[in-house]
């Protein structure tokens, strides 16, 4: 029997098991413990001849197949990963990509794209960014404008989630220029614009953001799909930043009325969340209308549950409690969120911290709360989140007025 080297034996074993849809317990059977099988797959144990014979029998193969060439493994695993979206196939794909240098660049591109999506689904922003950075580099090597634009668009979106606004503006701007210069599809151009409008607004580049939002809306006119809904949502969010709440509400409502939740339930839920946030940002706030949006979103949550969506709704409930003067409820919700691994974008995480400091100010810890808000505003400014920094200063001023003069009852923040 040939000596089978680790960790390649473990990788091959896991690939063969996954291809057959077997659990570790099913493959181990009566002749082996699942713990031992797990250590073999991870490369922690060297396989004995007896173990190899047992596993080959369970898999219905000859022991020599454990030496399977890795040259074709990326294509095989890519087929597995595209036909079955699971953590296990994605982990196999991640392993295959690590040793895939020299293989077909198009296969590597597909693999990196899928791995980025996998990390995004799990809310692992840093992991996603790592794969997308490699995807951007590989796209430049391949040289196809479509692939470059798509990789840069996704990369810009992940940078925005991490709060890295300057490189996000650069990546989204390059993706948009590629789409225009190479006359790429309307879909590619609109996808780049979705990110570009958001990051330009966050960087305080309002004239650019407005111009690009108009271009985006013109591009999706006549559609009623996910891209159309996202375009209206993005343009509406820009109106909110400019304080044009009535115009924002018209755009959000148009998207809610015209978009079928069966098309993309996650987008439908996020539109409801955006509308609820709008009702809380209006002057005066409309907590009852926000409550109705939250309830509609929560009713649909079991059908599209992700940690990020659950956390977005919990954050919204905390802000609603704050607006209604239910400070103990707001604190309890924030504490519960603080005990979980947050899967929220950078801006949403900062807004949670802002709310926590507002609650401190209103409970009498004025100096500590103000110092916390000042630090957050300065950090946002340093990260070029100009819009967010201005919002924090405005909320600090409103909160102080409310604490000192009880201005506007439950309407602050």
Spell out what each predicted region is:
Residues 18-39:
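Short alpha-helical DNA-recognition segment
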Residues 48-65:
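DNA major-groove recognition helix of helix-turn-helix/homeodomain DNA-binding modules
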Residues 94-101, 133-140, 173-181, 213-224, ...:
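Amphipathic alpha-helical segments of tetratricopeptide repeats
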Residues 82-95, 120-134, 164-176, 202-215, ...:
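Helix-turn-helix repeat elements of alpha-solenoid scaffolds
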Residues 67-71, 103-110, 143-154, 183-195, ...:
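Alpha-solenoid helical repeat architecture
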